[in-house]
């Protein structure tokens, strides 16, 4: 189906104006108002980061969600993401879930439009209507998600499948609607309007990012999701996203997710009345044969749109094997330890991990004045205003959304074939010359990150030629001879973002190499100062350029006179009975794709949703301590701290914790090997890290052992040695040198912390374990050591050593 030219042209040049840009005071007020009802939850607010496939239940054994890693075929997510990426547009409708800003979000499939000013209700979304010919690209991913849902929650799937009206199914599944989110960190919310008797499904379709976990706010659990992951969950529990984890300001990232659900209002009487009205109307048109010949009314259940009741869990690191599918072989043993560890008055956590699960007077958190706004990286990185277009945050982020309009497949609908061919040739020529020069620069310096623009080069001339074509493309899109200043601003911003992306994606250059700033300066030369080069050119070059400019203008005018493209009736006024006209059969066998049912059976073969069996025998735990390198019972930390560090505000904040002071005043923990401990049917033995026993156990706990192994290769090998001693899993207990708020901090606060953190934790390790130069690692560094599968990360709350426990499967990596 061809796009609506008028609508597309309006969207191309629909950029924010100065009047639309709010003042900082207005933005702050809007943010404060939004987070009152929809607060953001950072990683620091949670206890568990869950990395693997698993079944997560509440305190009464009710399923919160089932997460499946790499559950979708690559081709299915690729096909769907290519189409659905354009469905996520700026919308104020969900701004309360984004700190008062308009996120990139959209809907597809069918929608009821109840409460919307749209006159015609209960029908296809505008996106599906306008992309009907391309819509089948989503069918494989919808089919695969539906079958995964059916295999892990058959009763919920059946209830939803029985209730959904057949006329609004997406490809025969129990889903009526898709919500597509791009670069959207959601604040805490429940999904209003979903069918109460079923579940929602979320899939990550595309992206490169860290963080942005799906957080279940009332349970302190984060589920990390990457492309191809799926989660089937109760969306009536409050959920949100944690912060994006950027190593530096302006780091590039993207994330595209899709939520699959049944919009319950589509099964209410008002919607059925609309379906029937349209059907009766269609019967009066002898030239129209509807795909669906009748409307079967179904029982829709009671949909109250209320949050699900919360039955909290009492977590511990031993809760993870009770959840993770790859650790179900040791789930019963883990439950024995978990129950004992979380019992009132239990000190098992201190015995195994060196400190309790929670400390009330740990290192104090920073105030909001030290933190970034939770939606601060929603748009592209901030840029200064310079040259040919506005580099403001809002203008550039809008251009990122619209750069697709300069792709050839879009332009082919709106400009003449002759002008399109000129555009493709000029664009290709410039990229070829840029690529040639970049290759030469890398040959001289392989570490080079910046592109050196030579004003007298062939590449520079090719850029001006491309700008000449681009200017006529702009006028062709506008359908007039002169562009308004705001239209020029919009186009050249989009043009620069398009070329920046082309250099990165097609030439594999760093984004900073052909930066927007560099392109902006050259556009300023073209638009405002480029003519100064013209008078210095040889007469033959001046003539060539004038003739070329005339040819480009003629090509553009030819496109304007060739007549408008045929377009479909406007979606707003579409009153036809066009339900299911977009449907078609997917021939999985012809494409050699696995049938969704067989694929789901394989993916879910290890899923466990029932109760755990009871363990009767002895559960054996080995706790490994660092060798005692020092016999000192107490170390004066002040002796080794430079004055500049000791007087810093960050050092004072860290040292202000009563829990930290207790650690500094306590005796070294590993001066001698503790005797074995028996707690019910749990037997705990201890060993120093250089003298591992050879007999097998159920679980191995490495208590700050890796901090005394500075070499990463040796540290990774040690984890493998420990894994060979257990039938269950390994618990890697270590300091995370990055504080729990690290990725939410402003740059200055992060720098202040980085300046003192390593020395601070080394002091605590020296006191606690006698490790004189502890290798304290970041979360990423710790996880890179794990040679098998890291199932989860447990964060000891308020820990003065910022201790985390990584739960590691002994099985090889998938």
UniProtKB/Swiss-Prot annotation:
EC number(s) per entry: 1.14.11.6
Chain spans, region DNA-binding JBP1 domain: 392-561
GO CC list: nucleus
Source domain of life: Eukaryota
Keywords attached to this entry: Dioxygenase, DNA-binding, Iron, Metal-binding, Nucleus, Oxidoreductase
Binding site for 2-oxoglutarate: 255
Sequence intervals crossing the membrane: none
Residues covered by region (Thymine dioxygenase): 62-264
Note on how the cofactor is bound: Binds 1 Fe(2+) ion per subunit.
InterPro entries the UniProt entry points to: 2OGFeDO_JBP1/TET_oxygenase_dom, DB_JBP1, DB_JBP1_sf
Entry keyword Iron: yes
Location of the protein in the cell: Nucleus
Binding site for Fe cation: 189, 191, 239
Catalytic activity, as annotated: thymine + 2-oxoglutarate + O2 = 5-hydroxymethyluracil + succinate + CO2
Molecular functions per Gene Ontology: DNA binding; DNA translocase activity; ferrous iron binding; thymine dioxygenase activity
Top-rank EC class of the record's enzyme: oxidoreductase
Site (Involved in J base recognition, conferring specificity towards J-DNA) residue list: 525
Keyword S-adenosyl-L-methionine: no
Listed cofactors: Fe(2+)
A single BP term in Gene Ontology: base J metabolic process
Family of the protein in this entry: Belongs to the TET family. JBP1 subfamily.
Entry remark concerning the domains of this protein: The DNA-binding JBP1 domain (DB-JBP1) is necessary and sufficient for binding to J-DNA.
Function: Dioxygenase that catalyzes the first step of DNA base J (beta-d-glucosyl-HOMedU) biosynthesis by converting thymine to 5-hydroxymethyluracil (HOMedU). DNA base J is a hypermodified thymidine residue found in the genome of kinetoplastid parasites, which is localized primarily to repetitive DNA, namely the telomeres, and is implicated in the regulation of antigenic variation. Also specifically binds to base J-containing DNA (J-DNA).
Subunit structure: Monomer. Binds to DNA as a monomer.
Name by which UniProt lists this protein: Thymine dioxygenase JBP1
Species this protein is from: Leishmania major
Lineage: Eukaryota, Discoba, Euglenozoa, Kinetoplastea, Metakinetoplastina
Gene: JBP1
């Amino acid at each position: 189906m061809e796009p609506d030219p008028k609508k597309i042209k309006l969207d191309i040049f629909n950029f924010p104006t100065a009047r639309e840009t709010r003042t900082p005071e207005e933005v702050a007020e809007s943010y404060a108002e939004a987070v009152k009802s929809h607060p953001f939850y950072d990683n620091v607010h949670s206890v568990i980061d869950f990395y693997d496939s698993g079944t997560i239940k509440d305190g009464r054994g009710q399923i919160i969600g089932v997460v499946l890693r790499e559950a979708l075929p690559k081709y299915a997510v690729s096909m769907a993401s290519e189409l659905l990426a354009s469905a996520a547009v700026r919308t104020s409708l969900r701004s309360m879930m984004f700190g008062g800003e308009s996120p990139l979000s959209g809907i597809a499939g069918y929608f009821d439009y109840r409460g919307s000013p749209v006159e015609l209700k209960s029908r296809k979304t505008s996106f599906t209507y306008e992309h009907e010919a391309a819509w089948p690209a989503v069918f494989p991913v919808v089919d695969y998600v539906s079958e995964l849902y059916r295999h892990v929650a058959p009763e919920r799937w059946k209830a939803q499948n029985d209730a959904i009206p057949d006329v609004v199914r997406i490809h025969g599944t129990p889903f009526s609607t898709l919500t597509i989110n791009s670069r959207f960190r959601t604040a805490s919310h429940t999904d209003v309007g979903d069918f109460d008797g079923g579940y929602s499904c979320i899939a990550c379709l595309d992206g490169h990012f860290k963080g942005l976990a799906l957080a279940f706010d009332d349970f302190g659990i984060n589920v990390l999701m990457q492309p191809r992951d799926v989660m089937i969950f109760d969306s009536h529990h409050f959920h949100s996203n944690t912060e994006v984890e950027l190593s530096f300001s302006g780091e590039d990232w993207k994330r595209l997710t899709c939520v699959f659900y049944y919009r319950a209002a589509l099964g209410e009487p008002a919607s059925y009345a609309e379906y029937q009205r349209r059907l009766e109307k269609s019967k009066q048109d002898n030239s129209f044969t509807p795909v669906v010949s009748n409307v079967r009314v179904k029982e829709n259940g009671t949909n109250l749109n209320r949050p699900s009741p919360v039955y909290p869990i009492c977590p511990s690191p031993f809760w993870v094997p009770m959840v993770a599918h790859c650790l179900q072989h040791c789930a019963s043993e883990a439950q024995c330890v978990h129950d004992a560890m979380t019992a009132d008055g239990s000190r098992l956590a201190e015995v195994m991990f060196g400190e309790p699960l929670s400390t009330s007077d740990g290192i104090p958190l920073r105030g909001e004045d030290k933190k970034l706004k939770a939606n601060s990286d929603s748009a592209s990185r901030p840029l200064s205003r310079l040259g040919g277009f506005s580099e403001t945050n809002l203008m550039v982020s809008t251009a990122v959304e619209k750069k697709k309009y300069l792709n050839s497949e879009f332009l082919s609908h709106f400009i003449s074939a002759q002008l399109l061919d000129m555009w493709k040739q000029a664009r290709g020529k410039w990229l070829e010359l840029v690529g040639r020069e970049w290759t030469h620069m890398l040959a001289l310096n392989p570490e080079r990150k910046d592109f050196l623009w030579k004003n007298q080069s062939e590449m520079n001339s090719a850029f001006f030629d491309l700008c000449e074509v681009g200017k006529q493309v702009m006028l062709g899109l506008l359908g007039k001879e002169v562009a308004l200043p705001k239209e020029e601003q919009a186009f050249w911003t989009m043009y620069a973002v398009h070329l920046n992306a082309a250099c990165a994606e097609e030439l594999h250059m760093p984004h900073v190499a052909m930066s927007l700033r560099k392109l902006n300066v050259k556009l300023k030369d073209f638009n405002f100062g480029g003519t100064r080069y013209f008078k210095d050119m040889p007469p033959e070059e001046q003539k060539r350029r004038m003739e070329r400019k005339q040819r480009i203008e003629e090509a553009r005018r030819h496109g304007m006179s060739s007549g408008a493209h045929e377009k479909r009736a406007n979606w707003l006024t579409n009153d036809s009975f066009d339900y299911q006209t977009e449907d078609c059969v997917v021939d999985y066998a012809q494409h050699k794709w696995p049938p969704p049912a067989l694929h789901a059976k394989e993916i879910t073969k290890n899923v466990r949703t029932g109760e755990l069996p009871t363990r009767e025998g002895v559960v054996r735990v080995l706790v490994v301590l660092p060798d005692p390198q020092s016999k000192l019972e107490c170390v004066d930390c002040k002796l080794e701290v430079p004055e500049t560090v000791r007087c810093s505000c960050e050092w004072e904040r860290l040292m202000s914790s009563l829990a930290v002071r207790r650690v500094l005043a306590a005796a070294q923990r590993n001066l001698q090997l503790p005797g074995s401990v028996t707690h019910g049917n749990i037997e705990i033995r201890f060993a120093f890290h250089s003298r591992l026993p050879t007999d097998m156990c159920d679980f191995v706990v490495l208590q700050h052992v890796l901090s005394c192994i500075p070499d990463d290769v040796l540290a990774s090998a040690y984890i493998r040695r420990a894994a060979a001693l257990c039938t269950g899993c390994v618990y890697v207990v270590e300091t995370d040198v990055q504080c729990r708020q690290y990725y939410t901090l402003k740059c200055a606060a992060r720098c202040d912390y980085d300046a003192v953190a390593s020395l601070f934790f080394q002091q605590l390790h020296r006191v606690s374990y006698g490790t004189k130069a502890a290798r304290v690692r970041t979360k990423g560094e710790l996880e890179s050591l794990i040679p098998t599968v890291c199932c989860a990360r447990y964060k000891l709350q308020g820990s003065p050593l910022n201790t985390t426990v990584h739960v590691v499967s002994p099985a090889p990596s998938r």
